[in-house]
From Swiss-Prot:
Its EC number is 3.4.21.92. Belongs to the peptidase S14 family. It comes from the Bacteria. This is ATP-dependent Clp protease proteolytic subunit. The keyword Oxidoreductase does not apply.
Length: 220
């Protein structure tokens, strides 16, 4: 923290009072930054933005509308600046909103660049759908990663007709998600349906055998 304080006051022109306000507003967390020197020019970037310059995107949170919008924008931008060049998404997520996740999925399928997916910790629920949706032959996981599939969850209240409408929508989503997993994994729809009735956990090797990934990454 002392080094950061010295850097901020010397190079960013922040006085001690402003710096204290910034630190307090971050509630103890500072987004990681790096300094990159290019032809005598120094550029300050957060580490995730620097990695995106190498076409690497991180999905390391629960999937919600904000996360989905950001990730879709990153995919569209990288595809526009260099169409057809691979993009990598590193996934460590418990899942989240199905609708937000389907927006990411459709964008992955829409762009011309192949999207490689790598599970670095956990790809559960909707995140597992994004993992399996990577380009064939370019889906992988680290050895101790976990992959989990299950049926979509939801709830409803109000009039009986409203509950019926919500229940029908959940059933549609269920079939849609299972079809995506079956199509990309090569596992039969009936097996995906049966396995997803409850939380179905897989190790990296089991996920490979299931068709969720193509390779378990092991350092050679």
């Amino acid at each position: 923290m002392d080094d950061f304080r010295k850097y901020a006051t010397k190079h960013l022109g922040m006085n001690a009072m402003v710096l204290d306000d910034v630190i307090k507003s971050q509630a103890g967390y500072l987004n990681p930054y790096i300094l990159e020197e290019r032809q005598l020019n120094v550029t300050q970037l957060d580490v995730f933005s620097r990695l995106m310059m190498d076409r690497i995107i991180f999905l390391g949170t629960q999937i919600d509308d904000y996360t989905a919008n950001t990730l879709q924008a990153q995919l569209l931008y990288l595809d526009s600046v260099d169409p057809g060049k691979d993009i990598s998404i590193y996934i460590n997520s418990p899942g989240g909103s199905v609708y937000a996740g389907l927006g990411i999925y459709d964008t992955m399928q829409f762009i011309s660049s192949d999207v490689a997916t790598i599970c670095t910790g956990m790809a559960a629920s909707m995140a597992s759908v994004l993992l399996v949706a990577g380009a064939k032959g370019k889906r992988s996981a680290l050895p101790h990663s976990r992959v989990m599939i299950h049926q979509p969850m939801g709830g409803a209240q109000g009039q009986a007709s409203d509950i019926e409408i919500t229940a029908r929508e959940i059933q549609k989503l269920k079939k849609e998600l299972y079809t995506i997993i079956a199509d990309h994994s090569g596992t039969s729809f009936d097996k995906v349906w049966a396995d997803s009735d409850r939380d179905y956990w897989m190790t990296a090797q089991e996920a490979k055998e299931y068709g969720m990934i193509d390779e378990v990454l092991i350092k050679k």
